[in-house]
């Protein structure tokens, strides 16, 4: 069976200079829309960060729409995307469609305040960083200490972006915590739940 992710549609546009074709994601990038679809790893993080930096270079004041459908993945890769979102001058709006789990939910909440959106049937899952290690006891201990540092950092940032006490966040992350879109809005992870495209919603407004 062919991998459907390799079957990327092409968009053909007519202009005074003739015909140009783009893959669908490149065309959406022209509208300042970035997709994270699948695992958060070094490759996907590099693509997302590069696209954000490119759009900032084009227009540092215009927002970026970041669509997320991800089960999570590598913590360090997720932090690379998070840091880029905070570093660039463009406001980054986030939208969850499908699932935002683990690092996916972390990136969803990292969007510009007031511009974090979930679609009504989205699923959001929070949990603490995971780690599985092998080797000498001293190496395992060091890895465990590193995971705990990641956990403390994530707790602090969830609390900061969601307006919750760190103790509350720590209890929530202790086990897999499943949220509906409305649950996520009440918890402070997103600001809005939209069923239909809103004409005044910057996240999905076409570029002019």
From Swiss-Prot:
GO MF term set: ATP-dependent peptidase activity; ATPase binding; serine-type endopeptidase activity
Catalytic residues (positions): 102 (nucleophile), 127
Any Gene Ontology CC annotation: endopeptidase Clp complex
Localization per Swiss-Prot or TrEMBL: Cytoplasm
Catalytic activity: Hydrolysis of proteins to small peptides in the presence of ATP and magnesium. alpha-casein is the usual test substrate. In the absence of ATP, only oligopeptides shorter than five residues are hydrolyzed (such as succinyl-Leu-Tyr-|-NHMec, and Leu-Tyr-Leu-|-Tyr-Trp, in which cleavage of the -Tyr-|-Leu- and -Tyr-|-Trp bonds also occurs)
Record flagged with keyword Transmembrane: no
Main localization of the protein described in the UniProt heading: cytoplasm
UniProt xrefs under Pfam families: CLP_protease
Gene3D superfamilies given in the database record: 2-enoyl-CoA Hydratase, Chain A, domain 1
Origin superkingdom: Bacteria
One record GO biological process: protein quality control for misfolded or incompletely synthesized proteins
Matches recorded under InterPro entries: ClpP, ClpP/crotonase-like_dom_sf, ClpP/TepA, ClpP_Ser_AS
Key words of the record: Cytoplasm, Hydrolase, Protease, Serine protease
Known EC number: 3.4.21.92
Alphabetical list of HAMAP family matching this protein: ClpP (MF_00444)
Homology family: Belongs to the peptidase S14 family.
Subunit structure comment from the entry: Fourteen ClpP subunits assemble into 2 heptameric rings which stack back to back to give a disk-like structure with a central cavity, resembling the structure of eukaryotic proteasomes.
Function: Cleaves peptides in various proteins in a process that requires ATP hydrolysis. Has a chymotrypsin-like activity. Plays a major role in the degradation of misfolded proteins.
Protein name: ATP-dependent Clp protease proteolytic subunit 2
């Amino acid at each position: 069976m062919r991998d459907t992710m390799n079957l990327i549609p092409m968009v053909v546009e007519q202009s005074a200079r003739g015909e140009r074709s783009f893959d669908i994601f490149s065309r959406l990038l022209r509208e300042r829309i970035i997709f994270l679809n699948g695992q958060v790893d070094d490759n996907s993080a590099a693509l997302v960060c590069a696209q954000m930096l490119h759009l900032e270079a084009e227009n540092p004041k215009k927002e970026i729409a970041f669509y997320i459908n991800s089960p999570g993945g590598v913590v360090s890769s997720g932090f690379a995307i998070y840091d880029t979102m905070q570093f660039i001058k463009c406001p980054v709006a986030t939208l969850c469609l499908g699932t935002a789990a683990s690092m996916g939910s972390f990136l969803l909440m990292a969007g510009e305040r007031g511009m974090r959106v979930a679609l009504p049937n989205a699923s959001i899952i929070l949990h603490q960083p995971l780690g599985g290690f092998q080797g000498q006891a001293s190496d395992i201990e060091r890895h465990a200490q590193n995971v705990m540092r990641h956990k403390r950092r994530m707790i602090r940032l969830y609390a900061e972006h969601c307006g919750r006490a760190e103790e509350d966040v720590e209890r929530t992350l202790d086990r897999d915590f499943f949220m509906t879109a409305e649950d996520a809005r009440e918890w402070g992870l997103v600001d809005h739940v939209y069923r239909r495209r809103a004409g005044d919603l910057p996240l999905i407004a076409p570029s002019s």
